[in-house]
């Protein structure tokens, strides 16, 4: 259940997923081929409390079948190529799709300390259980699956470089642009529901620099840039939002001990600007800047059985006004939280 002031969204869904994969490897070629099927059956209930209680129920059904094959080729002159093709068949309440998705990626190592990467690929967003799949999720190091609106179709274009400056200093840059066709249900002039699509564009850039002066200490600095724009439907579940720009700086320090204990402290400095359409009376834009401090204490179990971690998020209980583009997996928590994980 997800709640806002005056209403609740309640979901009751049953999901089934099955996947099969075949692996082939020779001296210069490795091949991953497979198929999958996903089925969702359930209902969403929107409960209103003001001015009087009532609810709206919507049946949800989603069928998604896919096939794929990825070939990784070891080419001369330290070049590795990726060529792939996938197909998606979708039958859902919102839209039906039949898509063929080419994949092309290349990595080149002109020197022992330098790696260049590039990729162009098409993909379709699926309603996966916890976003889990055994299909390759990266093409030349670029992520191809995101938590978008289900059945979204998008082309991605990426370029990046990873550099080893010395035995103790590493860095890199990456840029990825995604052009999306996002399905949604609209209302025609007669008041009847119709299937429609919105054009989204996402531009994401990142940079990192890590330094390990000694074997028990690591220092790092990361920068992330995100720019989201759309025309018709809201971003991040907030009506009227037509553009979001994020700048995020992440300094971090990590400590390690040979007995299996490790500790990490990191901060996020966030600068977000939001653009709204003419239907929002509060104004055309707003922004917020804030710091959030997090920490984790971990222990690696013997024989690599797993890692136990005590994690603290938003340690100083920082308040902020932030729209997350991934509501199911938010980057920042609005209040202090401490939890234990086992991986």
Identify the role of each PLM range.
Residues 242-343:
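Conserved C-terminal beta-signal and adjacent last beta-strands/turns
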Residues 1-94, 167-176, 201-206, 210-224:
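Face-selective signature of the C-terminal outer-membrane beta-barrel domain
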């Amino acid at each position: 259940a997800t709640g806002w002031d005056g209403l609740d969204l309640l979901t009751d869904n049953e999901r089934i997923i099955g996947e099969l994969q075949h692996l082939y490897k020779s001296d210069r070629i490795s091949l991953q081929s497979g198929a999958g099927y996903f089925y969702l059956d359930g209902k969403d209930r929107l409960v209103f409390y003001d001015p009087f209680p009532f609810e709206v129920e919507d049946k949800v059904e989603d069928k998604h079948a896919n096939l794929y094959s990825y070939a990784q080729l070891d080419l001369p002159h330290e070049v590795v190529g990726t060529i792939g093709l996938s197909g998606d068949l979708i039958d859902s309440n919102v839209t039906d799709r039949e898509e063929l998705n080419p994949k092309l990626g290349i990595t080149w190592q002109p020197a022992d300390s330098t790696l260049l990467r590039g990729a162009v690929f098409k993909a379709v967003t699926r309603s996966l259980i916890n976003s889990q799949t055994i299909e390759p999720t990266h093409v030349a190091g670029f992520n191809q699956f995101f938590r978008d609106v289900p059945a979204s179709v998008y082309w991605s274009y990426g370029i990046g470089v990873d550099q080893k400056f010395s035995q103790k200093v590493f860095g890199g840059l990456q840029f990825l642009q995604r052009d999306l066709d996002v399905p949604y249900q609209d209302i025609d002039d007669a008041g009847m529901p119709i299937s429609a699509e919105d054009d989204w564009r996402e531009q994401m850039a990142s940079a990192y620099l890590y330094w390990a002066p000694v074997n028990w200490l690591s220092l790092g600095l990361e920068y992330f840039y995100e720019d989201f724009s759309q025309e018709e439907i809201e971003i991040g579940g907030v009506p009227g939002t037509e553009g979001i720009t994020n700048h995020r700086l992440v300094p971090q320090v990590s400590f390690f001990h040979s007995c299996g204990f490790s500790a990490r402290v990191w901060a996020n400095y966030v600068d977000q600007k939001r653009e709204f359409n003419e239907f929002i009376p509060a104004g055309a834009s707003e922004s917020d800047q804030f710091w959030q401090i997090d920490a984790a204490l971990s222990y690696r179990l013997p024989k690599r059985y797993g890692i136990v971690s005590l994690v603290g998020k938003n340690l100083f209980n920082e308040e902020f006004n932030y729209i997350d583009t991934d509501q199911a997996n938010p980057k920042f928590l609005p209040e202090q939280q401490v939890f234990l994980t086992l991986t």
